[in-house]
Structure formats: structure tokens, C-alpha cells
Amino acid sequence: MSDHFNFNEAFNSQTMRGRANVAKATWASLGLVYVLVKMHRRNTKRRETKLYCKGCQQAMLHG
């Protein structure tokens, strides 16, 4: 195995291993996008609740 990463060998569309690596990279990137979107929405929801009074926040969180 060489010391440096060879992109063309790792993601070669002619080999089964290369195709598997492409599939794994695709699923990993989709998972990453999903997590980032979930985190962003969660932070947005928290920011919106800070605009209201504490009683309103509790009603929104429990309601």
C-alpha cells in the first residue's frame, strides 16, 4: 500500500471495490447533510423560543 491516498484507485468505477467506496461515500455524505440540517433546525427553534417570555416558552415546549 502506498503512503499517499490515490483518489482514482479508491473510487475506480471499473472495480467492485471502487463502486462500493462510491456508495459508502454517498451514504456518508447524505448522513452528514441530514445531521447538519437537523442541528440547524434545532438551533433555529431554540432561537425562536428565546423571543418569548419564560411562561410562553414552557407552554410552547410542553404544548
Curated annotation (Swiss-Prot):
This is ATP synthase membrane subunit K, mitochondrial. The keyword Mitochondrion applies. Keywords: Membrane, Mitochondrion, Transmembrane, Transmembrane helix. Mitochondrial membrane ATP synthase (F(1)F(0) ATP synthase or Complex V) produces ATP from ADP in the presence of a proton gradient across the membrane which is generated by electron transport complexes of the respiratory chain. F-type ATPases consist of two structural domains, F(1) - containing the extramembraneous catalytic core and F(0) - containing the membrane proton channel, linked together by a central stalk and a peripheral stalk. During catalysis, ATP synthesis in the catalytic domain of F(1) is coupled via a rotary mechanism of the central stalk subunits to proton translocation. Pfam families: ATP_synth_reg. F-type ATPases have 2 components, CF(1) - the catalytic core - and CF(0) - the membrane proton channel. CF(1) has five subunits: alpha(3), beta(3), gamma(1), delta(1), epsilon(1). CF(0) has three main subunits: a, b and c. The ATP synthase complex/complex V exists as a monomeric and a dimeric supercomplex that helps shape mitochondrial cristae to optimize proton flow. It is a single-pass membrane protein. GO terms for biological process: proton motive force-driven ATP synthesis. It comes from the Eukaryota. It is found in: Mitochondrion membrane. InterPro entries: ATPMK. It comes from Drosophila melanogaster. The keyword Transmembrane applies. The chain crosses the membrane at residues 15-37. One of its GO terms (cellular component) is mitochondrial inner membrane.
